[in-house]
Amino acid sequence: MKAVVAALAANLGIALAKFAAFLITGSASMLAESVHSVADTGNEVLLRIGRGRSRRARTAEHPFGFGRERYFYAFVVAVMLFTVGAVFSIYDGIHKILSPSELTSPIVAYVVLGLSFVLEGFSLRTAIREANLVRRPGHGWRQFVHLTKTPELPVVLLEDSAALIGLVFAFLGVLLSELTGHDEWDGVGSVGVGLLLACAAFIVGYETKSLLIGESASEETTAQIVAALEGGPEKFRLIHLRTSHIGPDNLLVAGKIGVPAELTAADLTAGIDAAEKRVRAAVPIAETIYLEPDIYRPGQEDPLDPSVAVVERSTRRPRFRSSRRS
């Protein structure tokens, strides 16, 4: 994934430059930004590890594969952002406010912050371009972060956005310290960076927690599955449907279908096979499908089904009350 590689390269170079600037200037804001970039670098490494491990072949112990490794490592990123980035930055900022020390060579900090802004902007632009390839038309960035099943892009987007805002905080901290002669402002800048990282960590953790628990298919994908199941000559009727993302590209589909009483066992088997083929043709990521047949009786449909809330049988067109990630 280009966005992760670009972010990794940018953060590694930025971390070294910021730490050198901290050693020269003694700025708490620069130290906070150094730790921020180190945390981001570690995060990109974790995302790559998770992506690699998710591709392992399924085993007897993990029959559905390892797709959720990507969600787990994205959650670890949130933990790192909070513990390594936010907590340290806030602690160091408070220490600088209580025990201020004079900045030296602030021009070095300005140069490094400017260079960092350019590199972080390049990384964010790469992430935006890659996200636009999969973002649905009409969906804003907030919807994209909330609805996507791919964890790496939202993490990189949030990291890079937080990094750019954090650079502004650090710049203001150094600038106000120099203009006012009160070095406490440098500590305030560090605290601002820490609070920003805490917010980013909360958002990443909240979204990846939901994915780790297991999210259903999106409304659009569910509609395609229902249409595929009921759209064949077998005259199947959906009673209830359960879907769960095993990974971004692996969807588990389990459903109970009502079948005509006159179907023979051979016809039923052939019909279920045909229905599964239609589902996979409509939704290629539906790798695992389980269908339980039952004799159809009117009114048998589950009205409280969380995936298919309302199915208008007269028009054969499904409507849904819920909407989840794409």
Model-derived segments and spans:
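Topogenic membrane-insertion module of multi-pass membrane proteins
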Residues: M1-A17
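Alpha-helical transmembrane segments of integral membrane proteins, especially early/N-terminal helices
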Residues: M1-A6, V35-V45, F72-V84, V118
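Acidic (Asp/Glu-rich) catalytic motifs at the cytosolic membrane interface
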Residues: L23-G52, I90, I94, P154-V168
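Alpha-helical transmembrane segments and adjacent TM-loop junctions that form the membrane-embedded core
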Residues: E69-S326
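Hydrophobic alpha-helical membrane-embedded segments
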Residues: L12-A20, T25, E33-S37, T41-L46, ...
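Residues that define the loop-to-transmembrane-helix transition and helix capping
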Residues: M1, S27-M30, D183-G187
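Aspartate-rich (DDxxD/NDxxD/DxxxD) Mg2+/diphosphate-binding motifs
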Residues: L47-E69, S99
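Short, charged cytosolic
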Residues: D40-R55, A131-W141
